[in-house]
Every structure is written in structure tokens, then in C-alpha cells.
Amino acid sequence: MSLQRALQYLWDAEPHNTDHVTPLFCLGQVYDADTSLKEVNDDTEEDGIVVPLDTSNDTSWPPDFLADVQSRIWLSYRTGFPLIPKSDGSGTIHLGKLKNMIRGGGFDPRGYTSDVGWGCMIRTSQSLLANALLFRHLGRGWRWNKGDDFVYLSEGNTESRGGESRNGGANKEQETAVSEETAVSEETIISWFLDSPDSPFSIHKFVRHGEKACSTPAGDWFGPSAAGSSIYALCNEFPDSGLKVYYNGNGGGDVYEDELLETGFPLLVLCGLRLGIDNVNPIYWDSLRQMLSLPQSVGIAGGRPFTSHYFFGFQGEQLFYLDPHQPKPAVKTTDKDTTSFHSSRIWKLHLKEMDPSMLVGFYITSEADWETFKGSLTASKEKTSSQIVHIHPSRHNIPSFDEEDEYVSIGGASDDDFVDVTKRARKVAAMTGNTGSGRSSPSILDSHLVTETRDIIESVPPRKRVDNDLTSAPVDVPKPVQKRSQSHGDWEKVEEPEEEMVEVESMKGMQDNGCSAEYGSLVDRDAEADDSTLSTETTDRDWVV
């Protein structure tokens, strides 16, 4: 670990439990924030007088919640692993990548022996997948202890110790799915993620798929789309994982039920989302928290701008996450110690600081569990200001848009080619200028394109739906278009040629590989991963998270 990183780690003090009222959530389990403060009895007795226990200064986390957090598999930066060769045609290593190599423990002109500075999105995506596999093979009640032993909590034991499922039926489904399976241990699951070219879910395999299917060279940052595409492909290549994957490669929160049911169970459902321009639009905060409170949740790979985290829970408006930016030596395939894959450290991030690009995962055990999941989304529809996951009977059976529909789609099917606008979002956008969406927003964040995007959105009549075309196609824009004058705040009508069309750039080549254009923030690939300097120039830059 570099001196800078060590100082940052020490400076970033671990958050304490200062809210003893608001419940704590961890992947569908809810915990009383005050349970740790009542270890034996709520009261103490002094000279025959019952005195309430003073808990006002206690800042510890409830032990049941902490045990659940420690049991999550945590993938992070590693150093000293077998070489990941430079991508074909890459003759040089830029200064930014060279600095990351040195930070990661050394320089090798042939490629990378550490992912420090560029692998955080891969690590958080690995964490999401690893915990889905943990649920698949060991169940939701499994708990990790240091050493070779572990604790398994049945549903009843979980409730008695303070953790409750938001849906007991889903927990029973998960326990049934693993009741007869003991061959796959936690050690086995972690071995699938070790940093070796032979491990099925290693960083080497993620990078290989990113190069082949997503045009992401070794040493470059992944976005949610490349991460989701990699998980989908690698699980298909390794059926021994016992987990199938449904991933809508076009991005967004659209889930097509007929395709999902054909995939089979147990199933990991992945949704790549973008919920705003610079930050998550507040109208989606309730939906995000609801996603993490579902018993099917396996977390979110996302983060703050330029930095990816693995989000597993929340308390109020604070999200809990595991941070992959803690470099550790690579674990050898012969090492059975799994301690470095677990953490008792809890990080918090307010929803307003969260980057809008993310990969959301759900573990579905069976068709019955799928029906339960759908019911949970339906029940919460009236409680949340805007849904972020939309379930359709099929890709070709999406109802036409009217006043009651959730969204209107404009443009093509790739991540960067369309925006969805909810009725509430349209109102908020008119007041705040934030055109965040439930599916995707343009990745190019310069002011010119943001203005053009807003113009297109505002030009669509409320009762008109422009359907997505699965291939790239021009989209007619109603004329005249209302545009804001550059010189003053008044609205002026600009007559455009009647034949003018908005051209949607073809992304077919990337769609065929299940990997759409990445969405995120403009960063310099030659800079360090933690740098947060935006640039208005697009030369030799990429839009990534």
C-alpha cells in the first residue's frame, strides 16, 4: 500500500453507529439499530432499584448486523498476481498507467501484475457475483467466522438474533435450494475468483472478455455494461457454478419475462442503470433503497464518480458499502485462508453523493421466488416516486405510451442512445435541469449535448410514444423545436428544416456481444483512477465510470 493510500485509509475514519432508531438493512435483512446496546438485559439492578441501561454514548454496531456484513465476500485490489498481458496493438503504456503499475508493486513492460488504479469496477462486480454464489450454495443464513469453522443461522435463529427478512417465503426458497448441497464450500467459491488465468471468475477472465466483446483494453476501466456482460459470459462458460444469468445487454431496467423464464433457475438477474446526469436523481432514492431491502437483492456495483463500491445495505439515506480500493497481496491457489476476503469495516455514503451509473443484481431461486419478487415490485410501486426496474411480458409486447405509463423512450437500444422520462422526472427536470432517467442518459456530459437532450425530451408530446428500434435508426423529432436562447433566459421558437432527423449512432457491433457503450463520466485514461478532473475535450478520452 502506498503512503498516500495508507494515510487516506487512516484519515477516512470508520463510521460509527450514531442512529439507534432507524433500522439497518443488509441484502434484504433488517436489523434493529439498538440491539447491540442490550447485550443481556435492558435494565440493570442496583440496591433493588431497576435502572435503565444508558446507551446514549454507545457507537458500536449491532452484533447480528456486523456478523452479516462480515460474511459478505469482499473482492479488492490485489498486487503480485500472474501477468495480464497488454492488449494486442498496444505498443506503449501511458504515464497514468505506469504510475498505477508502480503503485501496484512494480513495473512490467509486458502488462499488469496488479489492478491498482483501474480494476475497482471489476472487483465490485466480482463481489456482487460472489455473494450471489454464496446464497446459491450456502444460503442466506450462512455466517463466516475466522478459522475453519462457520455458523449457519436458520430462519428462526436469524429472527431471534435481531435480523428479520422482509419476506420470509423468499428465505425459505433459498434454504430449500441449498438444503441438499454441501459440496461447494466458501473456500471453493472464493477459489473461483482467485487472480489466476485458470480461475473461472478471475480478473484475468474479466479482462479477456472486456477486450474481446467490449473493446476495453487491459488496464482500462470497466463500466457497468462491460461488467454485466462479463458476468453473463463467464457464468455461461462455467456451468459448474450452478448459477444462470439473465442480463439485458441493451442496458436499462427493462426485464422481459419470457426470456427470463427460458433461462431457468437459480438465476442472477442483472440490470445496468443510469439514474441521473451527475448524481442519482432524488426521485429514485426510494426505489434504490427498496431494491436493497428485497430478500432477492445481492447488492449494487456502483459508487461515487470515478470510484466503484459494492453497496450491500442502508440506514435512512446512508448507503453501506465495501471499498475495493485497499490493495492486498494476491492469494495463491494453495492458500486456504479466506480472511482477506472479509471485512468488519463499514463505509457509508449518502445517496446524494452516489454516481448514477450502476449494476444492480437479484438472486432468484425458482419460478415461485420470481413471482414473489414481482409481487414485491408491484406492492412498492405506489410507495416509491419512480420505479427503476420494469417487467414486461416480452420484448415485443410493451404497451403503448399514455398518461399512466412510467416512461417514454427515445432513440436506439444501446446504453447511450436513449433516455426514459417519468412523469414526475419531467416535472423535476423542468425545475432543476436534471434529466436523470430510470434507464439511461447520454454519457457525453458537455453542456451542449445536455442542452440538446433536454430539447428533445421537452419536444415529445406527453401522450406520444416513440418505440425503441433494436437496430439503429433515425428518430423523427416534432417540429418546431423549443430551444433556450444562449443570450437570455427567454424561450424562442426556432424553425428547423422539416426533413431534419436526429441520427442515432449505430452500436450494433457492441450489441451483438452483449456489451453496449459505456455510460459514466469523462475521465482521462492516462490519469490515476482516483483523479476527479473533468475535461471538455474528447480527444483520447473515454466515457467510463
Swiss-Prot record:
One of its GO terms (molecular function) is protein-phosphatidylethanolamide deconjugating activity. The gene is ATG4. This is Probable cysteine protease ATG4. Pfam families: Peptidase_C54. One of its GO terms (biological process) is protein processing. It comes from the Eukaryota. The lineage of its organism: Eukaryota, Fungi, Dikarya, Ascomycota, Saccharomycotina. Residues 156-181, 459-545 are annotated as: Disordered. It is found in: Cytoplasm; Nucleus; Preautophagosomal structure. Disulfide bonds: none annotated. Keywords: Autophagy, Cytoplasm, Hydrolase, Nucleus, Protease, Protein transport, Thiol protease, Transport. One of its GO terms (cellular component) is cytoplasm. Its EC number is 3.4.22.-. Its main location: cytoplasm. The active site is at 120 (nucleophile), 323, 325. InterPro entries: Papain-like_cys_pep_sf, Peptidase_C54, Peptidase_C54_cat. It catalyses: [protein]-C-terminal L-amino acid-glycyl-phosphatidylethanolamide + H2O = [protein]-C-terminal L-amino acid-glycine + a 1,2-diacyl-sn-glycero-3-phosphoethanolamine. It comes from Yarrowia lipolytica (strain CLIB 122 / E 150) (Yeast). PANTHER family: CYSTEINE PROTEASE (PTHR22624:SF49), CYSTEINE PROTEASE ATG4 (PTHR22624). Transmembrane segments: none annotated. Cysteine protease that plays a key role in cytoplasm to vacuole transport (Cvt) and autophagy by mediating both proteolytic activation and delipidation of ATG8. Required for selective autophagic degradation of the nucleus (nucleophagy) as well as for mitophagy which contributes to regulate mitochondrial quantity and quality by eliminating the mitochondria to a basal level to fulfill cellular energy requirements and preventing excess ROS production. The protease activity is required for proteolytic activation of ATG8: cleaves the C-terminal amino acid of ATG8 to reveal a C-terminal glycine. Belongs to the peptidase C54 family.
